[in-house]
């Protein structure tokens, strides 16, 4: 039974002043911080299957998959830098419309291809 206790995982996104913090909530009781990412340094924000994202898909980067785990047309990919290690990372997530608008307004249309 213990195996299935953590099967139900949800992600909580918090976006404040250009910093995106992601927490993973397992079994609706245990919260774990996935990471904090500086979106003001993002080089690309795009839909997962867009030409821009597919052009960078072969880069070998640390990848965080914080999406639903199912192919969803709303999934986006963000290429940015990890606040702790200062290395380029790839982040998959499924934000709602208000989160998408906040990200685009903070980083500008030159980087965002949504």
Task: Describe the residue ranges of each PLM region.
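Short amphipathic beta-strand/extended segments with alternating polar/hydrophobic composition
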Residues: 32-41, 88-95
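Alpha-helical transmembrane spans
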Residues: 1-8
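A membrane-cytosol interface segment of integral membrane proteins
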Residues: 63-114
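Short, surface-exposed charged micro-motifs
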Residues: 10-12
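Structured surface patches comprising rigid loops and adjacent beta-strands/short helices at the edges
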Residues: 36-54
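Polybasic/polar functional segments that serve as interface/processing modules
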Residues: 1, 21-25, 110-114
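Membrane-cytosol interface motif
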Residues: 16-33
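Cytosolic, membrane-proximal regulatory domains of ion/volume homeostasis and mechanosensation machinery
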Residues: 49-70
């Amino acid at each position: 039974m213990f195996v299935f206790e953590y099967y139900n995982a949800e992600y909580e996104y918090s976006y404040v002043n250009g910093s995106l913090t992601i927490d993973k909530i397992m079994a609706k009781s245990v919260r774990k911080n996935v990471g904090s990412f500086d979106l003001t340094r993002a080089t690309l924000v795009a839909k997962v299957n867009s030409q821009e994202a597919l052009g960078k898909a072969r880069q070998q980067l640390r990848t965080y998959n914080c999406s639903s785990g199912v192919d969803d047309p709303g999934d986006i990919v963000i290429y940015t830098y990890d606040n702790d290690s200062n290395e380029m990372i790839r982040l998959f997530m499924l934000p709602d419309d208000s989160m998408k608008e906040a990200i685009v307004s903070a980083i500008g249309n030159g980087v965002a291809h949504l």
